[in-house]
Amino acid sequence: MHYFALGVKNNGGVEWKILFTQQKCGKYDAIMFDLKLKELFLHKLLSQPLHSLGVQLINQDMFFGRGAFSEKFRIKRVALVGLGAVGSMVANSLAHSGISKIGLWDIDVVEPGNICRSAYTINDLGKSKVESIASIIKSINPFIEASDICENGSWEYNLDDDRVFRSTSFYDNINYKNQEDAIKELDGYDLIIDCTGSNEMLHFLSYAASNIEIVSLCITNHAYDLLCITNRDGNPFELRKAYLSRIEQDTKNFYMEGAGCYSPTFFANNCDIAALVNLALKDLNQNLDNNQLMHSTIYSYSQRGVVADRISTYRLEGYDISLNVSSETLFDAEDIADAPDGDIGYIFGYYSKDGKQIMITHIVDALNAKDILTDVFATSKGLIDYIGDYRYSKENPDTYNQDSYDQIVAKAEDESINTNNPLLAVRNPDGSVTFFLYINGELVKFLLIS
């Protein structure tokens, strides 16, 4: 007895038929061969009756009705760049959620070490990752058209039996001479999801494709953290550089043996990666359903469970300068006790090279500031440094006193301090925090962007 399913497209839906047949019920034509020593009979199958166990007509809405993403996400054309552990899981989840227009970029083939923590199977070994993911998507979504999947990256064998990568894509040749080609290649996509973990790739996309919504997913060693960085909060490359530098990672113990994309590569099992990746996709879906790209978020495993540390963005009044600070950093600031002189603590962080983006990574109490700064300065390899003061205002909300102003001016003029434009964070009587930047001889207020 043999069973199989047959799907036939019918009026916008797929008519699924569950069929079975029995070999003994077939009609055969016997062909005789005289081999001198004995006769050999071969039976040629002429017909085989198929019996139906059931027929069900399912359209696309019914097929994905139990678990589809919002329509506002599903209609987007997604450019998925990087198909390793993270990227393959993203592709798998997008396919199960009804995303049907997708471009795929990668230059690797599937190797044995990839299987344990990705969407690939043993049947994909030796194939290009792009080809394998395209096949997986088609196997999940019967409504997808071949033209809806754009494959960028394949491996072929030449006449000398050498494996050669075939691509005209920007992926395998990241440089700024081909920016125009890259923009053309990404033309028509509504959302770029970068899963490469590559600084070069994110830098390239952040500048070459800044007019397209960008989500960059990057996982740390042991999958303790997943950074989901979006260009809703500014330049993704600068954001990831700052907030990845804040995380104290295990930079010594990487996986060295076996086959995989990189050697060394990070430790992390399938469950840990999938949990964080799907949390990020869940947040992305909910925000897109509300017609907005999600704020950058750092998902971390902690003693409290999984923490979603969301980045808030402020804009400086009258200037093209933005400020980023995470919710966990603001919680830390709330826990710092008031001081009689109003001098509560200090702000650490990073200025982008063009000076248009300021990223706060720490707000710490004055007593422990020196030791903490020494530690984070070393952890970030000099990227994170002092950038401002944190003070308590006994005055009206959203204001500062003369003493706070004088201290900030003194810091700006102190050549031993590595900033001419220090921040002032003021804790208001209700516990909220207002941020100011010293610029052109005055303290200018930042306004929160929704």
Task: Identify what each model region corresponds to.
Residues 68-109:
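Glycine-rich adenosine-cofactor-binding loop
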Residues 77, 190-191, 213, 385-388:
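Structural motif
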Residues 134-189, 196-199:
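A structured beta-alpha segment of the ubiquitous adenosine-cofactor-binding alpha/beta core
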